Swiss-Prot record:
The 4 large subunits of the cytochrome b6-f complex are cytochrome b6, subunit IV (17 kDa polypeptide, petD), cytochrome f and the Rieske protein, while the 4 small subunits are PetG, PetL, PetM and PetN. The complex functions as a dimer. One of its GO terms (cellular component) is chloroplast thylakoid membrane. The chain crosses the membrane at residues 287-307. Heme binds at Y37, C57, C60, H61. PANTHER family: CYTOCHROME F, PTHR33288. Its cofactor is heme. Binds 1 heme group covalently. This is Cytochrome f. InterPro entries: Cyt-f_TM, Cyt_f, Cyt_f_lg_dom, Cyt_f_lg_dom_sf, Rudment_hybrid_motif. It is found in: Plastid, Chloroplast thylakoid membrane. The keyword Secreted does not apply. GO terms for molecular function: electron transfer activity; heme binding; iron ion binding.
Length: 321
């Protein structure tokens, strides 16, 4: 009997622990999906850069903010170099999270490299570059698009400057690569977006009235947010607008409002920006030729100076005679 009781207790404990683990996994999965905004672009767009040159992240992150990129002016074939993306913002500001509370901003970036350029393999990255990268994890936009890299969301407090380790192609082994000047495109955002890919609004944007009329009732919902009832005097209908937790309400009961008038403030403090740079894939033979030319010019100058000094000495001797 005692053994039976012990067995039942063990089964109950095991079931309780299993349920707890499943709940935690579900929460973590939902959180990661909610925060992983590069996934939205990957799922909705085959290419992150439209034919117009606009990067698709701007479709969800409506506010325009600056972004910077630094790359070498030129690189040699089969060489690892740094592409530094800077996403500046005020570290003191807080954003509205999905649950309506305030929190720190995350950042993310997409780097569109020329064909043939790709993320450097771990064994090719120099220790000093690894130190700058930290714990960042980069991934390809598509498995077959190694030249398009994405990162994020990552904590903006720590990673407002992101170092991408890039490996340049070698035209000797990659026939698609050539010794030319190439463009590089980058997009960087800080904070959450205002619109989801399906067109629905997030709680990180302004909410407007859907009808003209008098605000007859405002109900604060138990989990946050508001239910706003608008009486339309023209046809006597009632319209109900819902505001999720996060934005601050600007209207009050009894107030007359017009259609499309702002019901809330705009809580967004982030934004998206894009920039481009150029890089030259330099031919080593051309570099060697340039060095030889410069060396010959220097030697010629030295010989001219020596010849001039010799000529001056001869003139001086002739004058003494």
């Amino acid at each position: 009997m005692q053994n039976r009781k012990t067995y039942d207790d063990w089964v109950k404990k095991w079931i309780t622990q299993s349920i707890s683990v499943l709940i935690m996994i579900d929460i973590m999965t939902r959180t990661s999906i909610a925060n992983a905004y590069p996934i939205f672009a990957q799922q909705a767009y085959e290419n992150p850069r439209e034919a117009t040159g606009r990067i698709v992240c701007a479709n969800c992150h409506l506010a325009k903010k600056p972004v910077e990129i630094e790359v070498p002016q030129s690189v040699l074939p089969d060489t690892v170099f740094e592409a530094v993306v800077k996403i500046p913002y005020d570290k003191q500001i807080k954003q509205v999270l999905a649950n309506g509370k305030k929190g720190t901003l995350n950042v993310g970036a997409v780097l569109i490299l020329p064909e043939g350029f790709e993320l450097a393999p771990p064994d090719r990255i120099y220790p000093e570059i690894k130190e700058k990268i930290g714990d960042l994890y980069f991934q390809n936009y598509r498995p077959n698009q190694k030249n398009i890299l994405i990162i994020g969301p990552v904590p903006g407090q720590k990673y407002s400057e992101i170092v991408f380790p890039i490996l340049s192609p070698n035209p000797a082994t990659n026939k698609a690569a050539h010794f030319l000047k190439y463009p590089i495109y980058v997009g960087g955002n800080r904070g959450r977006g205002q619109i989801y890919p399906d067109g629905s609004k997030s709680n990180n944007t302004v909410y407007n009235a859907s009808a003209t009329g008098k605000v007859s009732k405002i109900v604060r919902k138990e989990k946050g947010g508001y239910q706003i009832t608008i009486d339309n005097p023209s046809d006597g209908r009632q319209v109900v607008d819902f505001v999720p937790p996060g934005p601050e309400l600007l209207v009050s009961e009894g107030e007359f409002i017009k259609a499309d008038q702002s019901l809330t403030n705009n809580p967004n403090v982030g934004g998206f920006g894009q920039e481009n740079a150029e890089i030259v894939l330099q031919d080593p033979l051309r570099v060697q030729g340039l060095l030889l030319f410069l060396a010959s010019v220097v030697l010629a100058q030295i010989f001219l100076v020596l010849k001039k000094k010799q000529f001056e000495k001869v003139q001086l001797v002739e004058m003494n005679f």
